């Protein structure tokens, strides 16, 4: 359901846990952008 690394995205929430949407692709992040305030 969620998107893994290198998959296209437009929002952090589209990416799997501990991943952020940067430059249109999901990328791993230790902070996990999915919990952004």
Curated annotation (Swiss-Prot):
The modification 4-carboxyglutamate is found at residues 13-14. GO terms for molecular function: ion channel regulator activity; toxin activity. Keywords: Bromination, Disulfide bond, Gamma-carboxyglutamic acid, Ion channel impairing toxin, Neurotoxin, Secreted, Toxin. The modification 6'-bromotryptophan is found at residue 34. It is found in: Secreted. It comes from the Eukaryota. Disulfide bonds join 2-16, 9-21, 15-26, 20-33. Its main location: secreted. GO terms for cellular component: extracellular region. Expressed by the venom duct. The cysteine framework is XI (C-C-CC-CC-C-C). Belongs to the conotoxin I1 superfamily. Causes hyperactivity, circular motion, convulsion, urination and death, when injected into 13- to 15-day-old mice. Causes gasping, backward swimming or swimming in a vertical direction and death, when intraperitoneally injected into goldfish. This is Conotoxin r11e.
């Amino acid at each position: 359901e969620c998107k893994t690394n290198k998959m296209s995205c437009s929002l952090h929430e589209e990416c799997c846990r501990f991943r952020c949407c940067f430059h249109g692709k999901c990328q791993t992040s230790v902070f996990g952008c999915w919990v952004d305030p």
